[in-house]
Amino acid sequence: VLMRLVGMRPVVVHGGGPQITALMERLGKKSEFVNGLRVTDAETVEIARMVLKGEVNPQLVAAINVHGNYAVGVSGVDGGLIRAEARDPELGFVGDVTEINPEVINGLLDDEFIPVIATIGSDETGQAYNINADTAAGAIAEALGAEKLIYLTDIEGLRRDVADAATLIRRTTADELDALVADGIIAGGMIPKIDSCTHAVRNGVKGGHILDGRVAHVLLLELFTDDGIGTMIENTGTEQMGTRP
C-alpha cells in the first residue's frame, strides 16, 4: 500500500505451494516435484485452482485492504490474463506462459487498484494449467515493462554456500546466475525463480530482487538503501549498475 501511495504501481503475483501440499495431504494425495515444479494431474490442477482462487488470493486481498480498499483479486484465467500451454507431458497440467494480456492489469492500475493475481492460466479451449508463480511473475513483469521484479521468499537472498550466511550475494548478473545453475550451486525450487528472473532482466526489466519476505519493511530496506538487504540481479554489463532504486 505504501508503494502505491508514493506513486508506484505494484502488482502482486502469488502461488500457494504449501497450502496446495497441505490440502493434498489431507486428501491422501502425494506431492511430486521435478526441478522445482509440481507434477499436476487433473485432480491436482483442480486442487490448485481451489486453493489459489478460493483461499490464498482472498486472504492476500483482505490483508492489503486492511490498509485501504486498494486490492482486487484476479486469476490468470480472468480476461485471458495468462494464456498457457502444457510444458511437458510428464508434468501433466503444468503450464508455460504463452501470452500475457496486460490490458487487464493496466486497467486496474489506471483505476488506482493493486492487482493480486493467482497463477492459474488457461489455453484457448479453457483447460486450466498450474503455473509456477515465479515463472508467471517474470512473464507479467516483461509484458508490463516493469522497472522491478521482486520475489519475496523465506530466505535472505542467494548464497554461494547455502550453509554460510557470509556468502550472501548482494549483487549479480544474469550470466553469473547461469553459471551458478550450471555448477549446481543453485538447484531445486530456486531454479524456476532464477530462470524467470534472468529472462526478465534480459528482456527489459531493469532489476530483479530476491528478498526474505519475513523481514519487516524488507521492500523499503531493499529499494531505498544503497546496500539493500537481499540479492539484486541485473542484465550483463555495467551500464545499468547503480544504487538500489
What are the roles of these predicted feature ranges?
Residues V1-R214, L221-L223, D227, N235-P245:
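Nucleotide/pyrophosphate-binding catalytic subdomain
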